């Protein structure tokens, strides 16, 4: 397998939109020297293929992995493209091996918004399209459940480097009706495109000493205007672009992000289920904000 493996069929969690205080409760530590012969992966075999997915994105064992992520939100209209805001946070993925080659994982996302290229949380910023002061809401999403089963996920390989990306299309009713939320709502229906993926090494995937391989997360989302931008139904979209790293310990995470998470939700890192009720940014906005009429 030198380039792409056949048939495209993927399943990734919705959440793009994390670490315990001791190394023993971090992600299964991936940075160990191999002591056993490598076990070659037959990517044409559905069982091998999905095991590689689980090992790169998460873990083969019943355990939790965490990603620190950071990126930038851009705005694009028919007339212009502008940098709008930065974002950063921690993604928790609680994995379970279901047997028969299948895996379940549950995502929890906790983070906040920043100036671009910064890890410092901001309370407000000036929207470059409108000139209006916007007040972001913090990022809290999940739990989102995903099951992956044996099939042909699409991989690309270059030497020891290997990666896959997944296109996920979402279409659902907007919790913010345009009648009640004229500036926060983009319409009755939300259409989103997530193009997320993971990069790693074949040598790590074939290392029998590892249950969890080192991984870099790629974040690429095309969304309607986020509610707090107060763009209403003006033509245009947001493009979220970022990277994340499967962490081995707290030293892999920005100190500002660790301080925020420990303050915002103590125990988030060590818990496999830091909260029970499912939430997302639109529900959170509707719960904690009031409509802005103009």
Would you name each region that the model predicts?
Residues 61-71:
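A short, Trp-centered hydrophobic/proline-enriched beta-strand micro-motif
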Residues 75, 79-215:
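Predominantly extracellular/secreted and cell-surface proteins with exposed
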Residues 220-294:
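Edge beta-strand at a domain terminus
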Residues 71-73, 168, 221:
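Short beta-strand segments that buttress and anchor functional surface loops
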Residues 44, 70-92, 284-294:
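Targeting-peptide/extracellular-domain and disordered-appendage signature
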Residues 25-59:
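C-terminal segment of N-terminal export signals and the immediately downstream linker at the start
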Residues 1-18:
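N-terminal secretory signal peptides and thylakoid transit peptides that target proteins
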Residues 12, 16, 56, 60-62, ...:
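Extended, solvent-exposed polar beta/coil surface segments
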């Amino acid at each position: 397998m030198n380039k792409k493996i056949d048939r495209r069929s993927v399943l990734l969690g919705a959440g793009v939109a994390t670490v315990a205080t001791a190394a023993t409760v971090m992600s299964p530590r991936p940075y160990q020297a191999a002591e056993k012969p490598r076990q070659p992966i037959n990517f044409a075999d559905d069982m091998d293929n999905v095991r590689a997915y689980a090992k790169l994105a998460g873990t083969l064992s019943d355990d939790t992995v965490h990603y620190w992520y950071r990126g930038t939100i851009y705005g694009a209209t028919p007339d212009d493209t502008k940098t709008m805001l930065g974002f950063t946070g921690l993604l928790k993925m609680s994995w379970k091996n279901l047997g028969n080659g299948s895996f379940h994982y549950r995502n929890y996302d906790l983070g906040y918004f920043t100036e671009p290229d910064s890890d410092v949380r901001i309370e407000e910023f000036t929207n470059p399209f409108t000139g209006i002061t916007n007040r972001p809401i913090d990022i809290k999403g999940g739990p989102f459940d995903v099951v992956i089963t044996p099939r042909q996920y699409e991989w690309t390989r270059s030497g020891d480097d290997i990666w896959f990306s997944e296109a996920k299309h979402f279409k659902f009713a907007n919790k913010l009706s345009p009648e009640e939320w004229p500036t926060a709502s983009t319409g009755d229906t939300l259409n989103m495109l997530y193009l997320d993926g993971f990069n790693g090494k074949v040598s790590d995937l074939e290392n029998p000493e590892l249950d969890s391989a080192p991984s870099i997360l790629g974040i690429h989302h095309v969304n309607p205007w986020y509610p707090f931008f107060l763009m209403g139904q003006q033509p245009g979209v947001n493009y979220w672009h970022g990277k994340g790293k499967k962490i081995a310990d707290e030293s892999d995470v920005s100190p500002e992000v660790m301080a925020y998470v420990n303050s915002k939700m103590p125990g988030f890192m060590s818990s496999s289920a830091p909260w029970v009720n499912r939430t997302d940014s639109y529900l959170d906005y509707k719960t904690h904000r009031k409509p802005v009429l103009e």
